[in-house]
Design a protein with these regions (language model features):
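Feature captures the catalytic ectodomains and active-site-proximal regions of enzymes
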Residues: 1-246
Length: 246
């Protein structure tokens, strides 16, 4: 982009193209000062902002590979911590590819989660397990199965401790990967994300007769979490509370 359209480029000789109309697909670099087909949009009243306004004590935990997902991305593209927000980064293991260590740092993350539950000082924990996605990217089916088994074990411990603490657990994902390890057309290893529907599990021992509505979408998770906390969703949120209460 710089060589073709940014004045002052000097890394190597270039030819000025007077009849070139250069449009960036997205904003790759703000210093380019070029037209953008799909400029970034500001996200208003995301879940983290609502929590901050009423001081919901929330704790974000993940290992290195997914730390940005529970902080920067969860906050709508904002790096700075909000009020009443705590963060903990657990280092990912130093290996060439994660099929060499499918457990990654899942057990270390889980230890921190269990300790936080026992302390009882946090309203919401946001946790991301990297294993199914990061090991899934290697295309190694047997190691991806191991990765899922490790996370299943960790979720079992967390869910048990949450039930003992009379808390509510939501388990979901923002995309697929590990569920499709073989390309159905070529038969080759499938290493990319998928757009398959993802599961949503809501474990709440205190809700008798509660069911989840059909046809849910990712946009419904934030309104559901706010409803579980007894908070109103802002108008900017287009999703709905997924619970059906009898």
């Amino acid at each position: 982009t710089r060589a073709l359209a940014v004045p002052g480029f000097s890394e190597f000789p270039t030819e000025h193209l007077s009849d070139l109309a250069f449009v960036c697909f997205t904003m790759y670099d703000a210093t380019f000062n070029l037209p953008i087909a799909f400029p970034p949009r500001a996200h208003r009243n995301v879940l983290a902002e609502v929590w901050a306004r009423v001081c919901v004590q929330n704790f974000r935990l993940a290992e290195t590979e997914k730390y940005a997902h529970v902080t920067y991305f969860f906050n709508g593209g904002v790096e700075k911590e909000h009020a009443c927000e705590k963060r903990l980064l657990v280092p990912s293991p130093k290996v060439a590819t994660y099929d060499l260590l499918p457990e990654m740092s899942a057990f270390k993350v889980t230890d921190k989660v269990l300790r936080t539950i026992d302390e009882g000082e946090t309203d919401v924990l946001v946790v991301n397990f990297a294993n199914p996605d990061m090991v899934g990217h290697t295309g190694k089916l047997d190691k991806t199965i191991e990765a899922c088994q490790y996370v299943d074990t960790c979720l079992g411990w967390i869910t048990k401790r949450m039930r003992e603490a009379r808390g509510i657990t939501l388990i979901t994902a923002d995309h697929g990967n590990a569920e499709q390890m073989i390309d159905p057309i070529t038969g080759s290893p499938h290493t990319a994300h998928t757009i398959n529907p993802v599961p949503l599990h809501l474990i709440d021992e205190g809700s008798v007769g509660m069911k989840l509505r059909s046809g849910g979408a990712l946009e419904d998770i934030a309104p559901t979490m706010l409803a579980l906390l007894g908070l109103e969703k802002p108008e900017d949120m287009t999703g709905r509370d997924l619970r059906e209460l009898e």
